[in-house]
Amino acid sequence: MESRALLAVALWFCVETRAASVGLPGDSLHPPKLSTQKDILTILANTTLQITCRGQRDLDWLWPNTPRDSEERVLVTECGDSIFCKTLTVPRVVGNDTGAYKCFYRDTDVSSIVYVYVQDHRSPFIASVSDEHGIVYITENKNKTVVIPCRGSISNLNVSLCARYPEKRFVPDGNRISWDSEKGFTIPSYMISYAGMVFCEAKINDETYQSIMYIVLVVGYRIYDVVLSPPHEIELSAGEKLVLNCTARTELNVGLDFSWQFPSSKHQHKKIVNRDVKSLPGTVAKMFLSTLTIDSVTKSDQGEYTCTAYSGLMTKKNKTFVRVHTKPFIAFGSGMKSLVEATVGSQVRIPVKYLSYPAPDIKWYRNGRPIESNYTMIVGDELTIMEVSERDAGNYTVILTNPISMEKQSHMVSLVVNVPPQIGEKALISPMDSYQYGTMQTLTCTVYANPPLHHIQWYWQLEEACSYRPSQTNPYTCKEWRHVKDFQGGNKIEVTKNQYALIEGKNKTVSTLVIQAAYVSALYKCEAINKAGRGERVISFHVIRGPEITVQPATQPTERESMSLLCTADRNTFENLTWYKLGSQATSVHMGESLTPVCKNLDALWKLNGTVFSNSTNDILIVAFQNASLQDQGNYVCSAQDKKTKKRHCLVKQLVILERMAPMITGNLENQTTTIGETIEVVCPTSGNPTPLITWFKDNETLVEDSGIVLKDGNRNLTIRRVRKEDGGLYTCQACNVLGCARAETLFIIEGVQEKTNLEVIILVGTAVIAMFFWLLLVILVRTVKRANEGELKTGYLSIVMDPDELPLDERCERLPYDASKWEFPRDRLKLGKPLGRGAFGQVIEADAFGIDKTATCKTVAVKMLKEGATHSEHRALMSELKILIHIGHHLNVVNLLGACTKPGGPLMVIVEFCKFGNLSTYLRGKRNEFVPYKSKGARFRSGKDYVGELSVDLKRRLDSITSSQSSASSGFVEEKSLSDVEEEEASEELYKDFLTLEHLICYSFQVAKGMEFLASRKCIHRDLAARNILLSEKNVVKICDFGLARDIYKDPDYVRKGDPRLPLKWMAPETIFDRIYTIQSGVWSFGVLLWEIFSLGASPYPGVKIDEKFCRRLKEGTRMRAPDYTTPEMYQTMLDCWHEDPNQRPAFSELVEHLGNLLQANAQQDGKDYIVLPMSETLSMEEDSGLSLPTSPVSCMEEEEVCDPKFHYDNTAGISHYLQNSKRKSRPVSVKTFEDIPLEEPEVKVIPDDSQTDSGMVLASEELKTLEDRNKLSPSFGGMMPSKSRESVASEGSNQTSGYQSGYHSDDTDTTVYSSDEAGLLKLVDVAGHVDSGTTLRSSPV
């Protein structure tokens, strides 16, 4: 029992002690107890002050604000007899030690205070460091008091305040003027506002003592406003710098204090700078600025930021919100429309809703062409079209580009412009035309509308039943309209019909109303309706019995032309023919709502003089217009009197005269490209009065109609049938009238080859013979000249180098031979084209080589050469690279040497193979939308599993047969077997039109391994193996290349500056980074990174990881990349094996070739099995050993956390077991620590150019690198490195913009490269492997 009681007591004591130590209350928390019980303690100077404080938890002391050199005199020690006890000791105290001494619990406000007076009669006033350099700020406010901080070391002094100048003394009055030894002298501020300085004075034993002088500054207090800049909500990405400016505007003589409140106020990287801003001349305000800076924000910095300005009497604040994003992003918001409909003439707005940081660059395209703002369109966050027309209809694409990550998002909106029905006759037919009695008449209504019409209807009404108001747009108003089918009381309608016709390039509806006989004057209305609106036309069908009016000439009159109006009447029926012009003021005379006929008001009309001609039956009255003008337009009335009834009959004719207009071509003539034998048709739309005469020219020569050239529609339409090569050229359409001419040009490009005539062949042969003669003569002359080979060789320019273990560095390049008789190629047979890559001192150019290959006349090649001003060392480096390429020899999966131009008389040029599809990284990124991981069922060339089985057996056999024996150096001109032999066995297909499958990725990996195995067999080390240095040729063949001379690595984010050279750190093995060791096995590490690039479809390695010293350390400690999005467990295991920390444990390239070949064969044997994307947990539980099930990508794992785990934890499958059994290496661990397991900070992206660096990202394993310090022994700063961007697309795109080849370069060359028979077999198998799985051929547009 006794032991239990002791145990209980001990437990209670531990609990209480723990509660006190962590700040948790036990029963209660009492203030600390001091050794003195007094609140005020008085001691003499030069004595020792010692106070002990005891409490219930950790204690600490605060004492008066003393100078820094006296802080060493204050001792705080632990008591020996208690846990929570501290003693404060101040030896030899002085007057300035007077003040409050505080003992308190840490992290709480619970404390005990004692005020200590150190009486020193020689220095009764305390000179405290808190006196702010003897300045007292006051405001002229009668209600405000100011405290002069002249505190005393003696509590009962008799103190007065002296002010000067003028001098004045103030003594305490017990009211508003007082002195307190703990605070100082208190006085109303207005009493000393006049003074320049003040001080306190006291008398002790007839001795007068003074405090320090205090300068009096009269200040204001009003704060007008506080403004934050930027004023709106701030968005930043993690790692970026935050700068907030807080500007306060106050009255003059204001002292201001700033304070900031924000989420991470204890941020160690924050910096606050306060300063005055110089006020503008003439202003009565003062400006203060406080700047808050956080160099690298994190997610914890997100929140509300408040700036507070305090002047002593006034406080003002302003706030803003700072939003911190994990990384730059961009996405379209919800609600983006894909279809917008508008009515012609209206204003259209197409807004863009997006979520992005930072604000994106916005580009608009219409039907693939960029749009710029003009007077009809405004582009920006929304597209605004002022008055939309039909021409504006089309597909509008908005492309958003994130300026940091360069990620792009696009959205297409189709704009449909609806056109309400437009009736063409409205502007052409006068509403006052008249029709002869009893005649058959046809009324037409030509309607254009979009979308098509719902219907067209005809209505009619008697003329007397409607009112006429000429001032209105539609002058006729009828209370009701009758359908034409109800013609009771009107004219009989024979038929109505609708037809469709192509008029002026538009599909229009022509509605026709046939009136059997014109007996009754009436109004006819044509009404058309579609979804956009309605249109109508009212026709005045005025029936007369009398004269007829005609216009001569019959064509539409134009100003400054001569024309005549003829009024013809039967001479036996009518007499007194007279012409009148109907003025605007006398168009008609109204009687209420009824219309008085024109003939009843002829006296109000303007009578015209005319000439009368007569024939046997008619009288004709003619009014002639010489040089007609626009003023001659109007309504003309011909009046004739009936001889029997004396009744006048009037006929009205509207005369329209067109304004003269210079010719104009109203549309654009676009260039056209076609092939031989096709038909070209182009329309030249014109306008002008008089009607222009159209003439066509070809290459400035008049074009006339021929058997294949047809001109129609007044020469507007030009058609060329069965085009020939000579039909290509510049075609000009010229439209002329009396006012001038207008021209428009278009270019016809004719592609294809047509058979040449015998004469052409003879000319070509003769020219070739003459050229060959001069070429031989030039060769004889040039061969007599020798060029020097002296100078130092700067091996740092090379990337594919000899193995340093095989030969000393200074001898290995010099001893390599160059056989000019085998490799020299004449410069005059090389036609240089467009540049493919350009660096600091080198460049690669596309060229046509004539006669470099005996199988063709012309072959497209790539030429490596130096830029102007290259040094002798750079010239030697390129020459050494040429020798290395000769030494390496020929291989299908290496960009092979074809020839060189080394003789004097021109630049040094190295000619290599041209790969038309560019580098593999760019190609894979462009094919992400066409990636199909599974096979479609069925075979491509023949159906059933027989073919697949045959292929798989033959595939493995022939892959094994292709060895590095092909490596013997051959001529630069001829090989044993042409690739055309292989093309005869298979159909040639465009590479960019095939879907990308998992089998393609394995095939590419296998080919690169074959190429690296070959380079290793030739004792060569490639020190920049990456997807940007893998080129893609025809038929899915990949080739290892190095365009070190043509890549500007100063601007390439994949190359990080480390010391003197720039290095591709993401691809380098740890031993290369730290020890500058380049071996075949360090190339295996780079091959593993290349596999990651391939199975991520061109992403940049280590996405989101800052490439710095920390990255290198983690890499050396075993942290590796996560599995790429499109890989299999087997391929990821292969990558991990390549990344083994021990170089000797990494697989050899020969082992990788065997393993990847087995995977490729296993892939071909799947016999119709589709690949299914499974969660990793399901994938790893499968017992199949094919190795072809795809894991879920880490992205999808994040979306479905319950189903899969984004980390790879699995045992090696059977598919890789054989590969490991035959290896000397150990298997990788079942789990891998990846960079996703480690929190990452978003780096600030910046590029540091340095012209002093070498041009190549692939540096030699030379003495130059051996001088660099050993990274294992030293730990230098990696500050000179360029951090990678947080978005993988930025780095990957940036790294490939300067690569040797760019995708999209196409060659007209129809010839093929010559390969050995073994390589031709490999080429065939590679191509079949790329196509056998597709079943039905799937194609897409070229990237």
Swiss-Prot record:
Present in an inactive conformation in the absence of bound ligand. Binding of VEGFA, VEGFC or VEGFD leads to dimerization and activation by autophosphorylation on tyrosine residues. May be regulated by hydrogen sulfide (H(2)S) levels via a sensitive intracellular disulfide bond. GO terms for molecular function: ATP binding; cadherin binding; coreceptor activity; growth factor binding; identical protein binding; integrin binding; protein tyrosine kinase activity; vascular endothelial growth factor binding. ATP binds at L836, G837, R838, G839, A840, F841, G842, Q843, V844, K864. Keywords: Angiogenesis, ATP-binding, Cell junction, Cell membrane, Cytoplasm, Cytoplasmic vesicle, Developmental protein, Differentiation, Disulfide bond, Endoplasmic reticulum, Endosome, Glycoprotein, Immunoglobulin domain, Kinase, Membrane, Nucleotide-binding, Nucleus, Phosphoprotein, Receptor, Repeat, Signal, Transferase, Transmembrane, Transmembrane helix, Tyrosine-protein kinase, Ubl conjugation. Disulfide bonds join C53-C103, C150-C200, C246-C307, C445-C526, C567-C638, C684-C733, C1020-C1041. Glycans are attached at residues 46, 96, 143, 158, 245, 318, 374, 395, 507, 576, 609, 615, 627, 671, 700, 717. The keyword S-adenosyl-L-methionine does not apply. GO terms for cellular component: anchoring junction; cell junction; cell periphery; cell surface; cytoplasm; early endosome; endoplasmic reticulum; endosome. The chain crosses the membrane at residues 761-781. Expressed in the post-pubertal mammary glands. The active site is at D1024 (proton acceptor). Residues 1-19 form the signal peptide. Residues 20-760 are extracellular. GO terms for biological process: angiogenesis; blood vessel endothelial cell differentiation; branching involved in blood vessel morphogenesis; branching morphogenesis of an epithelial tube; calcium ion homeostasis; cell fate commitment; cell migration; cell migration involved in sprouting angiogenesis. It holds the Pfam family Ig_VEGFR-1-like_5th. Residues 1267-1314 are annotated as: Disordered. Tyrosine-protein kinase that acts as a cell-surface receptor for VEGFA, VEGFC and VEGFD. Plays an essential role in the regulation of angiogenesis, vascular development, vascular permeability, and embryonic hematopoiesis. Promotes proliferation, survival, migration and differentiation of endothelial cells. Promotes reorganization of the actin cytoskeleton. Isoforms lacking a transmembrane domain may function as decoy receptors for VEGFA, VEGFC and/or VEGFD. Modulates FLT1 and FLT4 signaling by forming heterodimers. Homodimer in the presence of bound dimeric VEGFA, VEGFC or VEGFD ligands; monomeric in the absence of bound ligands. Can also form heterodimers with FLT1/VEGFR1 and KDR/VEGFR2. Interacts (tyrosine phosphorylated) with LFYN, NCK1, PLCG1. Interacts (tyrosine-phosphorylated active form preferentially) with DAB2IP (via C2 domain and active form preferentially); the interaction occurs at the late phase of VEGFA response and inhibits KDR/VEGFR2 activity. Interacts with SHBSH2D2A/TSAD, GRB2, MYOF, CBL and PDCD6. Belongs to the protein kinase superfamily. Tyr protein kinase family. CSF-1/PDGF receptor subfamily. This is Vascular endothelial growth factor receptor 2. The gene is Kdr.
